[in-house]
Amino acid sequence: MQNIPPQVQAMLGQLEGYQQQLQLVIQQKQKVQLELTEAKKALEEIEKVEEGTVIYKTVGTLIVKTDKAKALEELKEKVETLEVRLNALERQEKKLNEKLKELTQKIQTALRPTAG
């Protein structure tokens, strides 16, 4: 590490920061994907239910009664929100991957002359 120029050390620090950000984005993306899958399954099931069937939903630690129309509306809204969030996370992941690739190339280029 002592033979590495300060500017390369700074780039390595930046690279590590990008890697940590990417890890967080990937974790968030997985969580949103899971929530989206669950919401879509719930929506599918509620659409099969006849009108007038009693439906319950969880609100925090409570379970409350609701009707089909309201449950459908809320789930469709949730699916839409999660899809928007997922798209944003995918864009963020793509940008971070591009930054990582670019920075890795810069580091390799900077270290190449001293490697001989």
Curated annotation (Swiss-Prot):
A molecular function (GO) term: protein folding chaperone
Superkingdom assignment: Archaea
Record key words, sorted: Chaperone, Cytoplasm
S-S bonds: none
Keyword Signal: no
Transmembrane segments: none
Coiled coil spans: none
Compartments (UniProt record): Cytoplasm
Any one GO cellular component localisation term in the record: prefoldin complex
Assembly with partners or alone: Heterohexamer of two alpha and four beta subunits.
Family: Belongs to the prefoldin subunit beta family.
Physiological role: Molecular chaperone capable of stabilizing a range of proteins. Seems to fulfill an ATP-independent, HSP70-like function in archaeal de novo protein folding.
Name of the protein in its database record: Prefoldin subunit beta
Originating gene: pfdB
